[in-house]
């Protein structure tokens, strides 16, 4: 089944569940996907959409919630905070008790604040926000609150594991350079890379923050990196800022390895080709990392959606697996859904995903799960973007090993 057909079928099923639940005595659980479904960043939003439909479909196949199918509502946030704010209002007006989103930390910052303020004004009718992929540290730091949960990594998790994995393999070296986009995510990455240097055992000899998606020629930046004589380049860059940086590095003959967070974004390997070989990424999934369990998940995901899970999809699926496990321990009171009870259940839930143990830290609502450090290689079983390259895992960290400490800036007020 193609992704397009799968998505259309998912929307049709959601519409049918809306009609079928109309006469039910129990209040239906409505989950609103508020994602970037159009415009230049829609490719990532559609990946989240596929993951949500896949896993909520699994939950519905198993009986849904309280004997009713979970209803899936969709809203296009058009890639920006303003659009997201409008769509969150519409979703709540349509009866959604839970908002899910993941493709932008800027959008996530808007949604989490809107949800927080709404909940302050509407005691007893609180809305949950399940963050599937927005990784800015502040979301579980200064902006943390009881009704927000993050199911993805953050800068601290990604760059601690990628550095330690490379160190353990003997490919990190001693001299490192940090180059990142100049906004909250890039600053988070730079701060993490600097903070980890002494403990893991490398020196950050220089660092650069640059404009986001405006630079066409990274040659001057690469010349600076080359002059620094480094072994590893840490970068949280994504999209063209990653591709153009790596192409400029290859053209200049730079020998340093790139330690990245988003090298697995669809299209990257197809565009970079041999340039990407040997470079590193740390993510929550690799189909070869956990034997039959991880490969079986990859094959089932492809069977349902038409493509292997990649980039943001696995983390979203695994987070919603935890959510589904939590729902098993929640019983609606007098036919009404209590989102506070659902939040408490998520805090106490644990599940075995295709990658291993997955749980939620109650202090700040940062999920805890394994991370896989992997390199671009021809030896990978599953290839990326129709090329001869894929991602070959060489180090897996448990959730306990991966997770970062609770940030001092998180002061979560609990209900009651």
Curated annotation (Swiss-Prot):
CDD domains for the chain: PBP1_SBP-like
Q: Which UniProt keywords apply?
A: Amino-acid transport, Signal, Transport
| Annotated coiled-coil segments of the chain | none
Is the keyword Signal in the record?
yes
The record's Pfam families line, in alphabetical order, gives: Peripla_BP_6 (PF13458)
Q: What residue stretch is flagged as signal peptide?
A: 1-26
Q: Which SUPFAM superfamilies match?
A: Periplasmic binding protein-like I
Q: Which family does it belong to?
A: Belongs to the leucine-binding protein family.
Give the protein's function. Component of an amino-acid transport system.
Protein name from the UniProt record: Leu/Ile/Val-binding protein homolog 4
Q: What is the lineage of its organism?
A: Bacteria, Pseudomonadati, Pseudomonadota, Alphaproteobacteria, Hyphomicrobiales
